[in-house]
Regions:
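C-terminal regulatory/effector modules of DNA-binding transcriptional regulators
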Residues: 143-145, 151-300
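Residue-level recognition of alpha-helix initiation/capping sites
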Residues: 1, 14-15, 47, 190, ...
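A short, Lys/Arg-rich alpha-helix, primarily the initiator
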Residues: 1-10
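Long amphipathic alpha-helical segments
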Residues: 12, 16-21, 25-168
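A generic secondary-structure micro-motif detector
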Residues: 9-10, 40-42, 184-185, 208
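Short glycine/proline-centered loop/turn elements that form peptide/ligand docking sites
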Residues: 9, 16-18, 211-214
Length: 300
């Protein structure tokens, strides 16, 4: 059994610690456990309870109503919300709950439901990436371990790869060529895999190199493949203290090809403008870029 502090519960559910204390005093529906030194903590069952409260309160239920529900009634109400494809926060919490408990079946069923109801692109935008941002906060606060992150990321990667493989390969010699890669020491691959899906779904050719590609290898590949566009996503601070150094190394090893950059490091840094470089803020912008006249006509 894992032990969660009230700060952990706040980080996971979004319910403020002050609010939790007030609810406990007013409604007494959760009684925190105490250590031998009288420090409050919560267990896995309590966490699931608070996640259900978060789901219900974010969807119009008043706490006075929720406090009168039995555990079974609460689960039933959340299940009804989960059946609504327009409720991304419920699905984010379902993924969070199943990650914390390493419940692969629940994680995959939630993922499958969202994709069937909304398609992969909307699922990534509305559910997966908000979920991953939440995982990031939980990792920073020590609520989850690397094992939790690897568990959820691997399941999402498997689904992405399966969906990408199901798309038809492009044999049109006039189609644009995209080179997708992550630079040396960058291993966060979900954004790049989603870019792979978008590019392939629009009927373009893709050479996908994946994570942590040495800079000097880009020189060889870009000469041999002659891509129209090169795409990378920068996420980890481990790759370099200065994101502009990373971009400079990438550009030095390309041969004038257009570079598309995105990712958390790009958004949080002062990136210097460069010739033939496009900075994209989010997934919606990326989808619009791939379908735009810039790509379709290649400046013709």
């Amino acid at each position: 059994m894992r032990k969660f502090s009230i700060s952990d519960i706040e980080a996971i559910t979004g319910i403020k610690a002050h609010t939790i204390r007030i609810w406990e005093q007013r409604y007494a529906f959760v009684v925190p456990k105490r250590t031998e030194t009288n420090i409050r903590y919560y267990d896995d069952k309590d966490l699931c309870f608070f996640l259900n409260i978060s789901n219900l309160s974010e969807n119009g239920y008043k706490i006075s109503e929720i406090s009168k529900m039995s555990a079974e009634e609460m689960v039933s109400a959340v299940s009804l919300l989960s059946a609504d494809s327009c409720n991304p926060c419920v699905h984010v919490n379902a993924l969070t709950d199943s990650t914390l408990l390493f419940n692969e079946a629940k994680f995959l069923s939630t993922l499958a439901f969202c994709i069937e109801a909304k398609g992969l692109e909307k699922t990534m935008q509305e559910t997966i990436f908000p979920f991953m941002r939440k995982m990031g906060v939980m990792w920073q606060t020590g609520v989850i371990t690397p094992a939790h992150e690897h568990f959820s990321t691997d399941l999402i990667k498997r689904k992405l790869i399966c969906t990408i493989d199901a798309l038809p390969n492009c044999d049109d010699f006039q189609a644009k060529r995209f080179l997708l890669f992550l630079p040396s020491l960058e291993t966060h691959e979900l954004g790049l895999l989603f870019a792979h899906y978008i590019v392939k779904s629009y009927g373009h050719q893709v050479l996908y190199l994946g994570q942590s590609i040495p800079y000097e290898d880009l020189d060889v590949v870009s000469q041999a493949y002659q891509p129209d566009f090169c795409i990378t996503c920068l996420t980890s601070v481990l790759i370099d203290n200065d994101v502009n150094n990373v971009i400079d190394k990438i550009v030095e090893n390309l041969h004038g090809q257009k570079l598309v950059v995105s990712g958390p490091l790009i958004l949080s840094s002062n990136v210097h403008p460069r010739k033939n470089m496009f900075i994209l803020k989010n997934l919606i912008e990326f989808s619009e870029f791939v379908s735009s006249r810039i790509v379709a006509h290649e400046y013709k």
